[in-house]
């Protein structure tokens, strides 16, 4: 990863994975499994937000 556009692509990929995890979590009947997938989705969202911050910081430096 080298530039803001790459960072935004990574953020989009992570948000897509988070969306998929949430969709799968909604189909699970066992609470521990569902909760774990929801936690994973939150972790992915946080990582995506970090990539977006990096992209914004890179744009202001150019």
Each model region followed by its residue ranges:
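Long, non-catalytic architectural segments outside compact domain cores
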Residues: 1-62
């Amino acid at each position: 990863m080298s530039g803001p556009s790459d960072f935004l692509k990574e953020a989009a990929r992570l948000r897509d994975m988070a969306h998929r995890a949430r969709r799968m979590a909604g189909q699970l009947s066992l609470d521990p499994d569902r909760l774990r997938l929801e936690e994973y989705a939150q972790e992915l969202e946080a990582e995506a937000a970090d990539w977006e911050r990096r992209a914004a910081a890179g744009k202001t430096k150019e």
